[in-house]
Curated annotation (Swiss-Prot):
Entry protein name: Physcion biosynthesis cluster O-methyltransferase
Swiss-Prot/TrEMBL GO biological process terms: methylation
Organism the protein comes from: Aspergillus chevalieri
Keyword field: Methyltransferase, S-adenosyl-L-methionine, Transferase
Keyword S-adenosyl-L-methionine: yes
The protein's annotated pathway: Secondary metabolite biosynthesis
EC number: 2.1.1.-
Length: 222
């Protein structure tokens, strides 16, 4: 059997069984006790308060945010992910048959319609899953900038791997996730992400909660 690339390995992890338990295990237990950034306290409210009329969700996971974010039916919804399994799960949970699917790699320019711009973009727990060092990932912000309206907003969160201190449980989870290829964030630090955000957006707000970088950016630079 040929060896999987880091990207293929990351996609393979999100099989139906993992997606079945992801919300309870990751978004409830791990986020609260390992990463110390409870989903319902910090991440879901940020998502809910920043949904525009034309929204792009990158790295859809199980569709938790789409299902719990009270997105108006009038909102145009586009889902972007590299995993067909995750995409199908998220679309079903969103309850939006009209949601558009973009099966693509966010490390490459997003294959949206020519001239298409979004009011809002979300990327929760995406960056720490992308393969390679942090320098390989920051191009994502440039790609997002290119599809965001002048008055649009992008929000997200990622588990940092450098410059933060784990508790015992967090250390165990981190070592397992890195070893198993679930996360690739050993060089991911606040400074690199903030620098990349500020290079692409005029307004940048960040906070480190536990070991999670939570961010919001507006006014894409020309």
């Amino acid at each position: 059997m040929p060896k999987l690339t880091p990207t293929e390995r990351g996609i393979a992890i999100y099989n139906p069984l993992v997606l079945q338990i992801y919300d309870y295990w990751v978004l409830n237990i791990v986020n609260t006790w390992a990463w110390r950034c409870p989903t319902k306290t910090h991440l879901l409210p940020l998502f809910v308060s920043n949904i525009g009329s034309n929204h792009l969700d990158i790295g859809v996971g199980t569709g938790y945010y789409l299902a719990n974010g009270t997105i108006p039916q009038t909102t145009r919804l586009t889902l972007c992910d590299l995993s067909p399994t995750a995409m199908a799960k998220a679309k079903a949970r969103a309850g939006r048959e009209d949601a558009r699917e973009l099966l693509c790699d966010v490390l490459k320019p997003l294959p949206v319609r020519a001239g298409e711009k979004f009011d809002s973009v979300s990327m929760y727990f995406l960056l720490h899953c992308l393969p390679g060092p942090v320098g390989n990932k920051i191009c994502v912000f440039e790609h997002v900038k290119g599809v965001l309206k002048e008055d649009g907003v992008v929000t997200g969160a990622t588990v940092l791997g450098k410059g933060v201190k784990d508790n015992f449980f967090g250390g165990l989870i981190r070592r397992f996730c890195v070893y198993d290829g679930i996360m690739s964030n050993e060089t991911d630090d606040v400074e690199s992400f903030v620098e990349a955000l500020k290079a692409n957006f005029e307004v940048v707000e960040v906070d480190v909660i536990g070991v999670v970088l939570v961010f919001k950016a507006m006014k894409p630079k020309l």
